[in-house]
A protein has these predicted regions:
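Conserved acidic residues
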Residues: 31, 56, 98
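Glycine-rich, N-terminal phosphate-binding loop of Rossmann-like dinucleotide-binding domains
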Residues: 36-37, 62, 104
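Short alpha-helices
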Residues: 87-122
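Rossmann-fold NAD(P)-binding glycine/threonine-rich loop
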Residues: 42-95
Length: 311
């Protein structure tokens, strides 16, 4: 049975409801659902649409609908305007309340938030290597002992997500086409590596710019960036979205992964590069900002903007 994994609701655990079979009953009892299930992609797509069509908004951690044209993929500080596509989605689904919104993959949370405020300098080409914690695979060292003292240079599907999903975040809502049109730049190439760390995804990032910013301009842009969640003072929003660390040995997982209760992004080691223009290191908490916390913040944004309402 998939009970609490879908809705995280005490009543579903108590009543032993099955999240894949009792859709209409669950949808009638809750204001919205979070979805994070281990199923085939086409099954997840169908399940999330069933909840939406049952007039129950869905905030999804799954990748199934991340490229559905009228489903917003939201990183709340970066592209909150994408939720404006929801009325078009509701029209397609034939719903009044129901819709689907998704959050992006955990792998990109350590570098896309840092690149976003730098886009005013014309981000052109990006090379990134991510070093991803084992909790991203739902594992601990106890049940994945082969990861102790080991590195695996492959994580299935992560590199494609890490290259394509940022372009959708950088995209725009096309009112005429009634869809989100992905951006065509920057060009991103990525390698994703599994490392023996429990929590925290680190990214080594190399960037070419159309303009020629100074180090001071880049750091100022990072430190001063804030988004709608900060303006609205949403409960889960970090006060300072991005922190820049001056020390040469930061950010570190052991010292910085829980910055702003795991909802903030840590950046450091910004310096000029001999092949690209600039390089830096980013760090995010993959199971907080990159998963559950990011979904909660997305739901808070949707409630604040009137898309999730109490029945």
């Amino acid at each position: 049975e998939m009970t609490s994994s879908l809705v995280g609701s005490e009543m579903c655990i108590r009543d032993r409801m099955n999240a894949t079979e009792d859709v209409e009953k669950i949808a009638s009892m809750v204001d919205f659902v979070f979805c994070a299930v281990d199923m085939k992609k086409d099954e997840i797509k169908a399940l999330e649409e069933r909840y939406a069509k049952a007039e129950c908004p869905v905030v999804s951690n799954n990748s199934a609908h991340r490229h559905t044209p009228d489903v917003p993929m939201v990183l709340p500080e970066l592209n909150p305007e994408h939720i404006e596509i929801i009325p078009s989605q509701r029209k397609r689904l034939g719903t009044k309340r129901g819709f689907i919104a998704v959050k992006p993959n955990c792998s990109l949370q350590g570098y896309v938030p840092a690149l976003f405020p730098l886009s005013k300098f014309g981000v052109k080409d990006v090379l990134v290597c991510t070093y991803q914690a084992i909790s991203g695979a739902g594992k601990t060292f106890k049940d994945w002992p082969e990861m102790v003292g080991n590195i695996i240079p492959y994580i299935g599907g992560e590199e494609e997500k890490s290259e394509k999903e940022p372009l959708r975040i950088w995209g725009h809502v096309d009112d005429e086409k009634k869809e989100i049109v992905p951006a065509t730049s920057p060009v991103i190439t990525c390698q994703c590596i599994r490392v023996p760390v429990l929590n925290g995804h680190t990214a080594a990032v190399f960037v070419k710019f159309k303009k020629n910013p100074t180090k001071e301009q880049l750091i100022e842009a990072l430190k001063n960036y804030s988004g709608v969640p900060q303006e609205l003072n949403l409960p889960s929003a970090p006060k300072q979205f991005i922190q820049y660390l001056e020390e040469d040995n930061r950010p570190q997982v052991s010292m910085d992964v829980n910055y702003e209760n795991g909802m903030g992004i840590s950046v450091g080691r910004l310096r000029e590069d001999t092949v690209y223009d600039w390089k830096f290191v980013g760090l995010s908490h993959n199971t907080v900002r990159g998963a559950a916390g990011g979904a909660v913040l997305c739901a808070e944004l949707l409630k604040a903007q009137g898309y999730i309402t109490k029945k």
